[in-house]
């Protein structure tokens, strides 16, 4: 659709003929694309069009009508330095008003231009985003004129251009974070040891989350099993799960649970400066004897079913979450699993899931399910728990990440 105020003019009027003459004489043009390396603001220039300050308003309107995708034009002097900016919307609003065509028929561009806000075109995009944080929150397009190191005009960008760029960056980051997290935290996992059968499951509430679990075979007939929950959501939480994955991957039988926890706690504090914490349960299991060294880090979601009876498995000692206390001296407990027992480790996303009426799934419901199904093989028990959660939730959205590990000791 043509812009009002100019396209409705008689194309044979003297003003339009004069405008065409101005255009043919080069009063309006495009600067060359800026090819500066790196993530600089020049990359976001959505308009490279300029017009000389001595040009007529009609010449500007003619040029913009020929370039319908241009929303702003820089006004430059004879040294190619910007002296103003004209927005397409404001230009044609003025020309479209009553008597607007007559009012501006002899006017020059400076009558309509605004003083430009200048930004160096080699400035980092992220630095510009930081400086314009308040403007970005306003939700309206604000235009800025770019200049090179000599002050010459090199284009125009808007806060909308910047928001689109940042949105694309965020989308790519989330996609990368999701791939990274899924490489570390599998949606489904199964493991068969000498005397254990284990199934793991993790379903994120969003694209990325903060739940983590690991099952690792160690030398000497031992297993490492852990379930952790990172505070917060999103990319930051997924970054911490990557840290956890790296640490647990380096765990060996020569480690002690206590020394491992101390090192991991120190790293989380040094890296994330007490901004995030991690609850979790870490178990080192001797498959031959059934002896389990348990370190409960402010988590406590660990249940064991033996001969139809359900109890909470854990240490009497209390530990804070990882990343809270720089001087953490972890306490561990020892328990022994009997053949035929089942152990379930889970995150709070299981019991905190709500139905469409806002009622929680609750730990009591989980207890009932486990007491009735504790003798099932891990895969069947995992399927039953997943099905029951889905049935309970109904149309309600998944509230939090849901992660659990089911182990049967034979």
Where are these regions (language model features)?
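Bateman (tandem CBS) regulatory domains
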Residues: 34-49, 104-117, 248
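… and, occasionally, acidic/histidine-rich disordered N-termini of signaling adaptors
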Residues: 169-338, 342, 396-410
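The conserved cystathionine-beta-synthase
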Residues: 50-70, 76-77, 95, 119-141, ...
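Short, low-complexity N-terminal regulatory "tails/caps" that precede and couple sensory modules
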Residues: 1-48, 148-164
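Short beta->alpha transition motifs characteristic of CBS
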Residues: 74, 81-99, 152-168, 298-300
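Active-site-proximal, acidic helix/loop segment immediately C-terminal to a metal-coordinating Asp/Glu
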Residues: 235-254, 313, 337, 341-396
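Juxtadomain coupling helices with adjacent low-complexity linkers
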Residues: 2-5, 10-12, 126, 136, ...
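Signal-transducing coiled-coil linker helices
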Residues: 49-56, 121, 172, 190-193, ...
């Amino acid at each position: 659709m043509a812009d009002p105020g100019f396209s409705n003019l008689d194309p044979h009027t003297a003003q339009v003929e004069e405008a065409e003459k101005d255009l043919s004489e080069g009063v309006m043009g495009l600067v060359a694309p800026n090819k500066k390396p790196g993530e600089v603001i020049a990359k976001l220039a959505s308009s490279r069009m300029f017009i000389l300050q001595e040009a007529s308003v009609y010449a500007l309107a003619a040029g913009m009508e020929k370039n319908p995708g241009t929303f702003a034009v820089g006004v430059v002097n004879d040294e190619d330095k910007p002296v103003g900016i004209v927005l397409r919307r404001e230009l044609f609003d003025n020309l479209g008003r009553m008597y607007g065509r007559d009012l501006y028929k002899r006017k020059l561009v400076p009558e309509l231009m605004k003083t430009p806000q200048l930004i160096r075109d080699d400035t980092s995009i992220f630095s510009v985003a930081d400086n314009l944080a308040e403007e970005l929150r306003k939700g309206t397009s604000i235009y800025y004129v770019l200049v090179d190191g000599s002050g010459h005009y090199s284009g125009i960008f808007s806060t909308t251009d910047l928001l689109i760029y940042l949105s694309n960056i965020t989308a790519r980051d989330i996609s990368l974070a999701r791939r990274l997290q899924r490489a570390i935290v599998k949606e489904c996992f199964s493991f068969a040891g000498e005397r254990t059968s284990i199934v793991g499951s993790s379903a994120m509430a969003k694209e990325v989350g903060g739940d983590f679990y690991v099952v690792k075979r160690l030398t000497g007939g031992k297993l490492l099993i852990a379930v952790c929950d990172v505070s917060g959501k999103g990319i930051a939480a997924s970054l911490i799960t990557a840290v956890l994955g790296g640490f647990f991957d380096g765990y060996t039988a020569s480690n002690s649970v206590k020394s491992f926890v101390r090192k991991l706690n120190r790293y989380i504090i040094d890296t994330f400066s007490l901004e995030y914490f991690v609850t979790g349960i870490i178990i080192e299991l001797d498959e031959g004897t059934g002896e389990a060294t348990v370190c409960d880090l402010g988590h406590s979601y660990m249940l064991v079913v033996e001969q139809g009876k359900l109890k909470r498995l854990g240490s009497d000692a209390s530990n804070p979450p990882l990343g809270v206390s720089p001087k953490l001296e972890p306490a561990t407990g020892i328990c022994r699993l009997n053949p035929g027992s089942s152990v379930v480790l889970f995150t709070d996303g299981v019991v905190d899931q709500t139905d469409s009426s806002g009622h929680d799934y609750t730990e009591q419901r989980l207890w009932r399910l486990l007491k009735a199904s504790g003798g099932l093989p891990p895969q069947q028990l995992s399927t039953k728990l997943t099905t029951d959660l889905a049935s309970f939730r109904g149309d309600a959205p998944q509230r939090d990440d849901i992660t659990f590990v089911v182990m049967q000791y034979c």
